[in-house]
Amino acid sequence: MPATRPPALAVDVGGTKLAAALVDGEGRLTWQARVPTPGAGEAEALWATLAALVAGAPPGAEVCGVSCAGPMDTAAGLVSPLNIPAWRGFPLRDRLAAATGLPTWLDNDAKALALGEGLFGAAVGRRSYLSMVVSTGVGGGIVLDGRLLDDDGGNAGHIGHLIVEPGGRRCACGAHGCLEAEASGTAVAAVTGAPAAAAGPEVRARVGTLVGRAVASVANLLDLRLAAVAGSVALGYGEEFFGPAQEEVDRCARLAFSAGTRIVASALGADGPLVGAAAVAWWGAGVASLCSPPPSPPPVAPSPPGP
C-alpha cells in the first residue's frame, strides 16, 4: 500500500480562472481561493497574480501539485498553454517551488483530472479509462492498466487535437477541425458571438456529439470502456451535452470490445481540477496508486503421475 497522502497545496491554472486550495489526503478541500485569469498582459504580470493567490494559502501543505493546460514540458517544468498566450516556455513549476518552499510537481490539467477521478471519482477501481476537460479548451488524460499514459514531455492524451471535422475551423495549434477548435468554450463563443454558457440547444448538442465522436475513436483505439468528463462547458450544458455525446459514442464505438463504452460526468464536480492538481503531487511523490494490481493466478498443481 502507498504511504499516507500528505496535505497538498493544489494550484489550477485555467484560461478564465486561477485557483488554489489545500487538499487533505482524502481529497477534501479545506481552503480554497480563486481569481480571474488576467485577460491580457505580460508573462510576469500573470505570474504576479498567481503568486499573490498562492501566498494567501494557510500553512499545512507538505507538497504542491499544479495542473495547467498544455502543451508543456513536464521534465523541465515549462508551460506553453494555448489558452494563455502570455506564457510560452514559462518556468511555472520552478517558480511555484521557489514561492512556496514545497516540492512541486506539474502536469496537464486533464491528466491531473484523470488521477483525481481514479483516486476519488468516477473511475475508482477502474484499471483503464479516459478523463476529459471540456472548458475554455479541451484536454484528455488516459489511464491504461492502472498507469497514467505519459511521455517525456507530459503531453500524452491530447484528445483536443483529434480531427473531428476535416476542413473545419482553424485551431490555435495550426490544424483545421480539431476537437478544441470546434467544441471548446472558446470555439463556441467565437462561432456564436456570445459566451459559451449562453449557447442554445443545437450548439450544446453539437458540442456533445463532437466530444462523443472523439471518445469513440479513443475507445476503439485503446480498448477503453469509460470516459469521465469535467469542465465548465460539459458540466454546464448537462444532459444537453451528455445525451448527444453518449448517442455518438454508441453510433461510432461498435467493435465488440468498445461497444457499451460510457461517457459520464466527473464525480468530482467543480472541485475536480484542484483535487486533480493535488493528485499530481501525490503521484509525483509516489504516494498515490490508482488501483490495486490484479491478483496473481493460483499456481497450477502438477498432474498426478499416471498409473
Model-derived regions, located:
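ATP-binding/phosphotransfer module of carbohydrate and carboxylate kinases, centering on a glycine-rich
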Residues: 1-63, 74-76, 94-102, 119-126, ...
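Short beta-strand segments
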Residues: 12, 65-69, 131-137, 141-143
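Residue-level detector of high-confidence beta-strand sites
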Residues: 32-34, 82, 115, 151
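A charged helix-plus-loop insertion that forms the helical arch/lid used to bind
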Residues: 77-88
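General beta-strand structural signal in soluble alpha/beta enzymes
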Residues: 104-108
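Adenylate-forming
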Residues: 113-119, 139-142, 162
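Short, intrinsically disordered, charge-biased short linear motifs at domain edges
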Residues: 155-164
